Regions:
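Active-site-adjacent structural elements in enzyme catalytic cores
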Residues: 1-333
Length: 333
């Protein structure tokens, strides 16, 4: 199979991608978070191809993407007022909600659960694609399972060339880490995965928010999960990743004492002079944490090379988007 490159800047290419999706084909789609591996979320055979192309465990549910908030009612029932409040404030955008699912959604999409994860992406071309396709699009990150997520079309082509029909190139992703996921099916809202919408923003709107044990790394691989990204090793290059926190100077002393052949450093831009001779890669500025989220996966992919066996990764501290960046680094380690 030859993977076709399409442009999100061309309306005819968006229409062509929509036609492929309607006919059960796989198309990688751009979003503000990461690229998604898209299929008709109501077509069980098309959804199966997602799992096969990624090498993804089938107990890992998928996120359905819709073109506008009102489409939520077609795939979910018993939607609480909190969901509409969140949609009003954060859709279109990097927030996914877990809600009770209607019967028309295949069990393969939901991993057999009675709930489904849904989001309305910010990227206008992708919303138009979904509208033209006329179906919700199931789309996990467009990378081989376990590897760093894809934030450019070139990343997708590296992982998926010959495995999928097309890639819709929308340029680099703005946010750079996957969406925040919040479960609204319990007595209290529960954060299942941190992302572009922060816990602080959710609490300010909802008044309460529990943090799932999976976010804290306290979940076993035999646990049943309600959303993607909650178990299994994710986002990882082939090298061993060691997370290094603390002050810049103390971290540099620690790393330099241990640094050897086959090692690399993933650090903040301000720290590059501290790692002269240590093969450093900066993934953003410590003073602008959103540059860290935007640059993280691209940097991990750059360091996913046969000559690199160990990566010492500097991890931002604190809440907000830094919490999501730290979560992804810990999943990679």
């Amino acid at each position: 199979m030859k993977t076709q490159m399409l442009s999100a800047q061309r309306p005819e290419d968006i229409a062509a991608a929509a036609g492929l999706l309607r006919n059960g084909k796989l198309v990688a789609i751009p979003t503000e978070t990461v690229y998604g591996l898209g299929a008709n979320g109501l077509d069980e055979n098309a959804v199966l191809r997602i799992f096969e192309a990624k090498g993804r465990p089938q107990d890992n549910p998928l996120i359905l993407h819709i073109s506008e908030p009102k489409e939520l009612e077609s795939i979910c029932h018993d939607i609480p007022a909190q969901a509409w409040l969140l949609a009003e404030h954060f859709w279109p955008g990097p927030l996914t909600m877990v809600l009770p699912v209607r019967d028309l959604v295949p069990k393969r999409t939901t991993a057999g659960l009675d709930t489904v994860a849904v989001r309305c992406p910010k990227t206008a071309a992708t919303r138009e694609l979904i509208r033209l396709a006329g179906v919700p699009i199931a789309a996990p990150s467009a990378n081989r399972s376990g590897k760093p997520s894809t934030t450019t079309a070139a990343h997708v082509l590296h992982d998926m060339d010959g495995r999928i029909e097309a890639i819709l190139d929308g340029g680099p992703c703005e946010v750079g880490v996957e969406s925040t996921i919040v479960d609204l099916t319990g007595e209290r809202p529960r954060l299942l995965r941190p992302g572009g919408v922060t816990p602080e923003e959710l609490r300010a709107l909802l008044g309460e928010l529990d943090i799932d044990r999976a976010v804290l790394g306290q979940i076993s691989n035999d646990a049943v999960v309600r959303a993607p990204g909650m178990k299994y090793k994710h986002y990882a290059p082939s090298a061993e990743v060691y997370i290094i926190s603390g002050s810049s100077e103390a971290a540099a002393r620690y790393i330099r004492r241990r640094f050897g052949p086959g090692d690399a450093v993933l650090c903040f831009a301000e720290e590059l002079p501290l790692y002269d001779g240590c093969n450093p890669t900066a993934y953003g500025s410590e003073n602008d944490v959103r540059t860290l989220s935007a640059g993280l996966f691209a940097a991990l992919r750059d360091l996913d090379r046969p000559d690199i066996r160990t990566i010492y990764a500097r991890c931002p501290e604190g809440g907000g988007v830094a919490y999501a960046v730290g979560n992804r680094l810990k999943k990679a380690a």
